[in-house]
Amino acid sequence: GATARHNIRLRGGQCYALLAVGGQGLNDVDLKLHQGGNQIAADDTRTAFPTVRHCPSSTGRFRVEIEADGGSGRYFYQVFRRSAN
């Protein structure tokens, strides 16, 4: 399926949860988080609501990849800062 890429900046010492939501007609979305050339987190389960969590040790640029793996349509994503617990 089609893949969209978004660059984000995450702060070291913080924890984050990323959520993608497939809109109408998009019933399987894959969500991946990369830093440099390395994939560091992924959710490729068969769902329209994938999530990943990451607590980077240092501040840096990350790439979010959102892939339409079943169906087609719009998607939405959000990055939440969360507690380390």
Model segments located where?
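Acidic, Ser/Thr/Pro-rich low-complexity intrinsically disordered segments
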Residues: 1-76, 82-85
